[in-house]
A protein has these predicted regions:
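Conserved loop->alpha-helix
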Residues: 1-128
Length: 128
């Protein structure tokens, strides 16, 4: 399930060129495959950043860890805190200005891609 069903002509999306062999890997690996949806529970606008709390499914929450990585609406981010199925991210002003994240409000649904390495680690643990 993704938010694509709500897109219309003119909907702004976050797009990044694919990594080429030999390029520097400056973040975490993003496959571009949405695993599901997270719902914005709360937005706090702080002096030097915005803090978002998001809720996801229990199935996807098991792959999310504090200081780990998630991709939300195509933007690679570091998880700040996790409590059960709710997690938070901190967004700096530059990211708010150059992505669609600046327009996020409580109640909105966003695409969620969990960390690929966390997904693989969980699968390996299941197979033991």
């Amino acid at each position: 399930m993704t938010t694509a069903k709500h897109w219309t002509r003119g909907t702004k999306l976050n797009l990044e060129r694919a990594l080429k062999i030999g390029d520097e890997l400056g973040g975490h690996i993003v496959a571009g495959h949405a695993d599901g949806i997270a719902t914005i529970v709360k937005r706090d606008d702080l002096p030097d950043m915005a803090r978002f709390e998001l809720r996801t499914t229990r199935e996807l929450a098991r792959f999310i860890a504090a200081k780990g990585s998630v991709t939300l609406d195509g933007v690679s981010l570091t998880v700040n805190t996790v409590q059960d199925v709710v997690f938070s991210v901190l967004i700096i002003p530059h990211t708010l200005n150059v992505t669609t994240l600046g327009g996020w409000r409580a109640g909105a649904e966003v695409n969620l891609e969990v960390d690929l390495m966390a997904r693989y680690a969980a699968r390996l643990a299941e197979m033991k």
